[in-house]
């Protein structure tokens, strides 16, 4: 299809973009499978970043590094819409059985970020084909380290929201499970995903022989009391009407049974859907740890590993974007409102700074392939979601820029 021959009016444009996305499906899937098979985790993704930049150049864009991520722009001045895709995997083995599974046994795309990057690449290609007709500017954000909650912050610090200033932002996340492809899930009334404040408490005691505990200060004993005291914060200091979770997921201390160690380390997360409760819990976590340690003659060092707010989508922008999604004549496309999840997403850092919308796109199966959830080594995602995601990104961008 000649890109310049698209019929550019509301009634026809949506189906044309979906048709174009279907034409590009094989290439989108190939991009997804390459990124999947070469999964990288964390802040530095050299192979993934190089692949994304090469593809953008192939499509006629001029990508540049932005911190540890990649950005590119196209359009004609005016308002600026940011389209964001994360592209990092997880530090875990893959057992999906797919022919393109990551072979290293150390990293895997079990959260679908390979889809996000591949769909945004194809969306960039279509938008480049339509650049002369755009009524504004689209900025693309290919982000690392979402899983460690570092990526958005890294790219913000390197200017992703400036030069030109971003006016609004949109991101998708694919969702596996036992459900058909075609659902798009959103929340325009409240918190869509919880905050996450990751913390590390290093308890400092005094080492001694296990036979002479009085000669030392036991950091394991202090750590146990800190752990128990922190659970009371949820039970007795937070409003039961608000969802709050405090979890200690790691407790490490000692090397031998007859030695009281010098230190113990606790790591955990605080998650909530309420900003005030978040502030309370972070402050009280620090106070409880410090004062409990002091009671037993020890001390603590507290480090905040991640600080991500709740993901709260802008209601007006979300209503607008959902309206554009509903315009698309795609078989099986179905809105699912009022979705909220206790997981966290560092797109919330973007949403805290500019009006933003975040949607889940179902990428599941109704048979046994939909058995496993995200972050499971056996999870499988349905590649039929690809043209839906591509068309949605393009259509929402075109329509939003046209209106604004």
Language model feature labels by segment:
Residues 70, 90-92, 98-108, 115, ...:
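Histidine/acidic-residue-rich, glycine-tolerant segments that coordinate divalent metal ions
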Residues 18, 22-29, 42, 46, ...:
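Electropositive phosphate-/nucleotide-binding environments in soluble metabolic enzymes
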Residues 35, 83, 113, 140, ...:
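Divalent metal-coordination and catalytic microenvironments
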Residues 82-84, 93, 199-201, 358-363:
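Non-cysteine beta-strand/loop elements that form the S-adenosyl-L-methionine
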Residues 8-109, 114, 118-135:
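Acidic/His- and Gly-rich active-site-bordering loop/insert found
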Residues 58, 224-404:
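Metal-dependent amide/peptide-bond hydrolase catalytic core
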